[in-house]
Amino acid sequence: VLGKTESHLYRRGNFNGTFDDVINQAIMEERDTQISLSPGFRWGATLLPGQDIRVEDIFSQTAITYPAVYRNEMTGKFLKEILEDVGDNLFNPDPYYQQGGDMVRVGGMGYHFEINNKIGSRVSNMTLLKTGEKIDPVKTYIVGGWASVNEATKGPAIYDVVSNYIKREKSIIIKENRAVKIKGI
């Protein structure tokens, strides 16, 4: 047993879930980053308030072939490009260009997403949550993430990062996350 959850933990939404919030918080704290990115998977068992969080639960949320958690510098412009690209895979009006069902999960940053806009104009109002400042396209931010298919990616495995975070915190309480505002649903 790593810890206990006082919140309902799941990965079921198209833009985020509470287990995604735990994963992103773990990345930011364990890798000392301003922003975190986590792949939009909808798998793993849901945990109810009061349940123990076991190593098996972490594996069920994070078990993939490329678990290394990177820590890189990215510009605000590049962060927007990532969100726009993934968003276009989901919401391109031509179904032949739709390649996925889940948006990348983001920690430490909020943004607005307009589903019906074209690529390049869906993401706006990107904000660094810790300070409230707008994300500057030319400024560099420290970003952590995982599930990179780049073979050169170095860093600890995501299941170790999350396990260490939960062991340290002992009790997990997730507040409602409204950092991403979705329009056009």
Q: At which residue positions do the language-model features occur?
A:
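Catalytic centers of hydrolytic enzymes
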Residues: V1-I185
